[in-house]
């Protein structure tokens, strides 16, 4: 079983939001998943990104591969959470 981290679409017509899920790569986009590990809402300004970092790290260590979009979301979240160094 190849586990991937990818987006599962939810919401209404023209108002989507996405769940970040760990699932078998053979499952449908909105089908059965192993675990819900976050939420991504691109319609909010600024974008709403809520991730369960510990669970994402668990799945990555277990061999799960993130989709291109999830990898981009993880980079954005890491950049937003990084401490800013004060200017001297």
From Swiss-Prot:
InterPro entries xref list: Ribosomal_bS16 (IPR000307), Ribosomal_bS16_dom_sf (IPR023803)
One of the protein's GO biological processes: translation
Keywords assigned by UniProt, alphabetized: Ribonucleoprotein, Ribosomal protein
Coiled coil regions, renumbered to chain: none
GO MF annotation list: structural constituent of ribosome
A single Gene Ontology CC term: small ribosomal subunit
Family: Belongs to the bacterial ribosomal protein bS16 family.
Record's protein name: Small ribosomal subunit protein bS16
Source organism of this protein record: Anaeromyxobacter sp. (strain K)
Gene: rpsP
């Amino acid at each position: 079983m190849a586990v991937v981290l990818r987006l599962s679409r939810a919401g209404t017509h023209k108002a989507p939001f996405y769940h970040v899920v760990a699932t078998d790569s053979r499952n449908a986009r909105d089908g059965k998943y192993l675990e819900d590990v976050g939420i991504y809402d691109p319609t909010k300004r600024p974008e709403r990104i809520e991730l369960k970092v510990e669970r994402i790290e668990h799945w990555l260590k277990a061999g799960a591969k993130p989709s291109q979009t999830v990898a981009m979301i993880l980079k954005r979240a890491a950049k937003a959470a990084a401490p800013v160094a004060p200017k001297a």
